[in-house]
Amino acid sequence: MDMRTKLMAVVAGAAMAFGGTAAAQGTPAPGKVAATKAPAAATRGKTEVTWWGHAAFVIRSPGGAVIAIDPWLSNPKAPKGAAQPEALDAILLTHGHFDHVGEAKALAEKTGAKVYGSFELINLLGLPEAQSVGANAGGTFQVKDVTFHLVEAVHSSSYAADPKSPAQYAGAPVGYVLEIDKGPTLYHAGDTGPFEGMSLIATQFKPSVALLPIGGHFTMGPAEAAQAVRLLKVKSVIPMHYGTFPLLQGTPDALTGELKKLRNTAKVVVPEPGATTAL
């Protein structure tokens, strides 16, 4: 049994532990998107960040852009019965692993949104050309009042259309910096460990909020994430990619403790899955 198959088995077990299968929780199985009421528009003048558990976020800008990042919206931590977005302007993928691609194809088909990611991954998804934007670190794009940049990440990336298919190389992983007009600059790190290039991200883009993995094992844990906060010089951090599987043991409390050791005053913002944070 390869690691991908093992993780899929862990997902099934985790779903049962959280009260049944994904379908029983009111969220669709991977590749399926429930038809639900559209989410409310962003509060006037605010950027709204909704965490769907794991590394999945939906971001609404003051100018009306609605952007999903790594939309595994049926993950075991996903909010029960929450309305999935009916309208999206863009879907951003950090890499090809199933727990990040999630329902990207189904959401793209449903909403008509363009899907952005590494060139190889986008080719593997097989979406219509008009919705496929393959790029790489250094690429810059604009959607309404949001300018976003693909940046480096330190991880691996492969993609399989389903658990029974062999995984294929899906290009280099990336993170995203989102510069929001009349709003904050956000950094979604994707899956990564800390790296010196985070200092360049701080210098070039000056993000104020970082969405960082803290679970460990496949990404950085709390101690490494605290070092990333130091390199990025952000004022706030929203932890992600923790608690979804038993292997992801890092916690927000541990991150807070590690930041205190560094005498770093960045605020740790810990939303519940499904909760929206206004920035």
Swiss-Prot record:
It holds the Pfam family Lactamase_B_2. SUPFAM superfamilies: Metallo-hydrolase/oxidoreductase. InterPro entries: Metallo-B-lactamas (IPR001279), RibonucZ/Hydroxyglut_hydro (IPR036866), UPF0173 (IPR022877), UPF0173_UPF0282_UlaG_hydrolase (IPR050114). This is UPF0173 metal-dependent hydrolase MXAN_1394. Belongs to the UPF0173 family. One of its GO terms (molecular function) is hydrolase activity. Keywords: Hydrolase. The keyword Hydrolase applies. PANTHER family: UPF0173 METAL-DEPENDENT HYDROLASE MJ1163, UPF0173 METAL-DEPENDENT HYDROLASE MJ1163-RELATED.
